[in-house]
């Protein structure tokens, strides 16, 4: 009935950092996201991280976060296929299109193309889907105004330390794939929009009945409550690796969900403390 994944793998980390805790009610209300606490449980003061543990005003080991981990483990064990606990994100992603899954709670719009492919068990003969995207559910600690999910902002990054001429060339190239003509074609192929004009284009209105609610979602103001990873996270790679290792320990039963999140809180605070002492974050 339910599809998920639970293998000890980096993808288990973004299963949680991509806003699972916020759906349970971890993090503060309002936009921009994460003021003062975000979905990683990290609290900021004067735009600098001040801690993620409850004792430091954070939320990564608070009641909502522990509830979120418990609910994930319960659903994985009670409703997902037996093999799901040993799958990675990449292995679990194609399974719903095989037609044996009732819901997939952790859903990226990047899955839409395979789920809308004609001739698959999840698409009707007329090309309309047998499934529908639904608003993210939220847990008992959630309050109106909190975020309810994650979406990548799809930004381009140009490094200051790169060769100046190469950086200029990269900037020029970026103008092409983000141009209106190209971005609309990309939206039709990958179904991950970057422009409002693409979302509102008449060609997407024509395709909307075959995309299971994708177009309607992006035309709705509610999309603002699905936000990107905010600026509270000072070192994404270094902190992200802490998540999948600690979550995996709870999945296998090595530790309880509360212990897993307590350990994560301590490790995150330790890393952020080192970053603070190193003075690498600069001024606001």
Q: Language model features by range: what are they?
A:
Residues 82-98:
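Short helix-initiation/N-cap motifs at beta->coil->alpha
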Residues 165, 255, 259, 266-284:
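Conserved N-terminal structural module of periplasmic/extracytoplasmic solute-binding proteins
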Residues 23-86, 136:
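Glycine-centered hinge/linker elements that transmit conformational signals in sensory
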Residues 129-141:
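A structural supersecondary motif
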Residues 67-71, 165-177, 256-263:
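Short amphipathic alpha-helical coupling segments at ligand-binding clamshell hinges
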Residues 3-53, 145-159, 238-248:
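Periplasmic solute-binding protein
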Residues 109-125, 140-245, 276-284:
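C-terminal lobe and pocket-closing loops
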Residues 97-107:
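Alpha-to-beta junction loops
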């Amino acid at each position: 009935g339910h599809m998920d994944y639970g293998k000890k793998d980096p993808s288990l980390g973004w299963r949680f950092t991509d806003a699972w805790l916020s759906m349970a009610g971890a993090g503060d209300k309002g936009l921009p996201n994460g003021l003062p606490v975000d979905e990683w449980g990290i609290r900021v003061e004067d735009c600098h991280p001040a801690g993620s543990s409850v004792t430091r005003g954070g939320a990564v080991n608070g009641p909502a976060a522990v509830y979120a981990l418990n609910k994930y483990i319960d659903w994985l064990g009670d409703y997902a296929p037996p093999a799901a606990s040993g799958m990675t994100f990449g292995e679990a992603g194609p399974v719903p299109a095989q037609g044996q899954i009732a819901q997939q709670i952790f859903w990226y719009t990047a899955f839409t193309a395979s789920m809308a492919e004609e001739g698959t068990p999840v698409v009707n003969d007329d090309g309309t889907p047998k499934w529908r995207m639904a608003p993210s559910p939220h847990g008992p600690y959630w309050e109106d105004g909190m975020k309810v999910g994650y979406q990548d902002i799809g930004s381009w990054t140009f490094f200051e330390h790169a060769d100046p001429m190469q950086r200029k060339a990269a900037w020029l190239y970026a103008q092409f794939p983000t141009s209106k003509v190209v971005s609309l074609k990309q939206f039709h192929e990958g179904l991950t929009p970057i422009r409002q004009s693409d979302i509102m284009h008449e060609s997407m209105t024509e395709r909307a009945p075959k995309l299971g609610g994708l177009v309607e979602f992006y035309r709705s103001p509610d999309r603002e409550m699905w936000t990107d990873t905010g600026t509270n996270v000072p070192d994404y790679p270094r902190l992200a690796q802490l998540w999948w290792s600690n979550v995996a320990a709870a999945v296998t039963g090595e530790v309880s969900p509360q212990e897993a999140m307590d350990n994560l809180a301590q490790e995150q605070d330790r890393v952020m403390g080192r970053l603070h002492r190193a003075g690498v974050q600069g001024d606001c």
